Structures are given as structure tokens and as C-alpha cells.
Amino acid sequence: MTLITKDFLKTAGIFCLFLLLQLLIPLVAWGLSSLPAFAGTVYNIPGGENATFDITIPAMAFSFFVVQLAFVRLLHFTGWVSIKLFSGKSANFGFSGMPMFHFVGVFVVLSMGLQLMLLPLHLDDGNTNALFKQLSSNIWGVLSLVVVGTLVEELTYRAGVFQLTRKHIGNIGAMLLSSLLFALVHGNLYQAIPAFFLGLALAYVYLRTEDLRLCWSAHIANNALAVLAFHYAPLAHLGEQWPVWQQVGVGALMVAMGGFGLLMKGSLLKRLFGRAKR
């Protein structure tokens, strides 16, 4: 079997396992909900108020955590993804000694800017935020949304899909493919559109460093801010009352600042457009 076939089979396998993970979590939660240790408020699925769902929030939150952790272990066991946090490559980004803080800040600014620019479109989130808000009321849910879930996504889309395909379809092609899949699994335009562009930013950094510290840290910071917004109304509704020109203008400025911060080290176009070495 040729190398290209093996790599694309691994890519398809990782992505399918990720999708299977999403189906497995509620099944595990349903099984745990009958145990006294996981008694609690019933997990409310918006739109299903007239149906009976015997899944409790503690069970759903714990299932998210355990199943995602098992997924990380499975990737490590199969060797399909290299779980490497230290590559030894430069991650300076123009701020000697502070690359992680720099990129985390850049990523959060970029993320907030995209959200502001999309506010005038009034996109539907498919009740995803309502579901995640319930999970964020439990410590296992917070750990899943902020820590383990972000690691799963970085391993799947950056260390997995991007790294496996870049040798065959080039850096740009791999960035687009991994970001598109990353966007699609979010399941709604409210999250998918910013996820695509943020996926490009994360893939770009992984291309430069092959070091998950920066990608994972930035992803953690972004999700932590989202969880905070669930419980702090001024942050959750930031910019909603602004006129459209201000939403788009401030958002575009933040996106420009984030983009400049991402590229400030200098031109990487030569490497970016070059095909990765085999």
C-alpha cells in the first residue's frame, strides 16, 4: 500500500473516530444517569421539552470528559497521531521568551473580532450554546469544554488531518481541508464560520512550529472565554447593542490586529506555499 493511501486512510479513520465519539458520549451518559453518583438536574435539550430525556447533567459532563480522554489514549496507542508538545523549532513570533502568551492573545483577539463581524448576520447556533452552558455548570463539563475537548480537536485536526495530508496536497491544501472539516463538525453557521478561519490560524502556527503547546493553549483560552461568557452576561452580549457599522468596524480592526500579530515574525509565504518534505 502506498504512503499516500496509508496517510489518507489514517486521516479518514481519525475523522470517523471523532464523529463516532460524538455519538458515543450521550449513550455513555444515558447509562451513567441511572447511577446514584450521577444524580442531578436532567440535561435539557432545547426543542425537546415535551419529550423525556433521562440524561443528567453530571452524567453528560462526566461522559464528555471520559470518552474524550479515551479518544486521546486511543490515538496515542494506534500511533496515528504524534502527541508532541515540544518540537524544538522556533516559536518566537517576534516576542523573545513569550511566544505562548503572544499567540494566545493574538488568537483571542482574532476570535472576538470574527464574532463581532458576524453579529449583524444573526446566525443561528442550533442551541449549541444552551447545551454547553448546562455542561459548564459541572466541573467535569468545564474540564471537557476547556481542556480535554480542545486537546482532542487539536490532535484530530492539526496533528492529525493537517499533518497527515500536507505531504500530499501541500500546506495550503492541508490547511483548507483541516479547517473545513473543523468547521463542519461544529454543525451550525454561528460556530462554523469563525471555526474555519480560526482553524486556518491554528494550522498556520502548527505548520511553523509543529508544536501543540501554542495551538492547544490558544484553543484553551478561547473556550475558557466562551465558558466565562455563559456566566457573565456583559461578556456574552458584548457588541449586540452596537450599530452595525460599529460591530463590523471594531470586529474588522480586531481581526486585522490578530492577523498582523500572527504574521509579524516576517514573511513565511515561501514555506507556506512550498510542498512539505516527505
Residue ranges and their predicted role:
Residues 18-27, 63-73, 104-116, 247-270:
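Hydrophobic core of alpha-helical transmembrane segments in multi-pass integral membrane proteins
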Residues 23, 27-31, 191-248:
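Functionally important transmembrane alpha-helices
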Residues 12-16, 58, 97-105, 139, ...:
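Hydrophobic alpha-helical transmembrane segments
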